[in-house]
Amino acid sequence: TEIQSAYLLGRRNHFELGGVASHVYMEVILPLLDIDRAEKVWNDIILKHDALHSIFTSNNTQKVLKEFAYYKIECNEGADIKEKIALTRDKLKGKSYNADIWPLFDISVSQLDDNSLLHLSFDFLILDWASIWILLKEFEECYFDGKTIMDNSYDLKEIRTSQLKLKHSSKYLSDKDFWERRIPFLPDAPLLPIKNKIVKNGFERIQLRIDENTWSKIKSNISEIGVTQTSFLVTILALVLNRWSSNSE
């Protein structure tokens, strides 16, 4: 897809801020897991989803592997569990995968006294954020509820073929024509005060949480004027960018 091509380009060191993979690392606390059983469920999930047993070749083609090894989950346990968790976290939180080597993910478990800490690391070449939550839901339903993993109705190739067919539809062509005519009139990117030289490519996630009462009032107010939550937040972002940008548009 177009976004996968962009991710592959961003992994290369051909330009400033390049050489960075699009990647997510997350931790999930679950009731105490039996590692062998959890491993079996994850392997069933890997087998079901083509993306989880795919790689990317040197000519930027996604290849679904027909044969691949049984995935072994790394398990941390013992008296020094805190140190092992820290080591796993440091190893995975900034991991960069070779796109042509399977797997493009890591799954580990740290066994605590009463819970298990699930460590998940995925390259966004194979999954997006919504897909990760689907995988987690599948794992929990299969492991805790005993549900059977159902086969997919479509494979990756069929889905991509359907997407490409949409590009020949009248609606797609009409929308494309509209935006191509708008391009000359779109404003430039905001000129923001930034560092001239980036010493190290890295990321830090900054979060702001709005308390439930305040957010309920916001939702009530914006719904009265027909504004969606997404539009509201994007507008705030635009106002902040405008505040710091040296070009008014």
Which residues does each PLM region occupy?
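Acyl-group handoff/entry surfaces in thioester-processing enzymes
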Residues: 2-66, 79-166, 187-193, 215, ...
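Short, charged/polar, Gly/Pro-enriched secondary-structure boundary elements
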Residues: 66-74
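Alpha-helical hinge/cap motifs
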Residues: 124, 226-229
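Short, intrinsically disordered, charge-balanced linker/junction segments flanking boundaries
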Residues: 245-249
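Short amphipathic
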Residues: 25-29, 73-76, 204-211
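Flexible, P/S/T/G-rich "lid" or insertion loops adjacent to the active sites of thioester-utilizing
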Residues: 10-19, 172-227
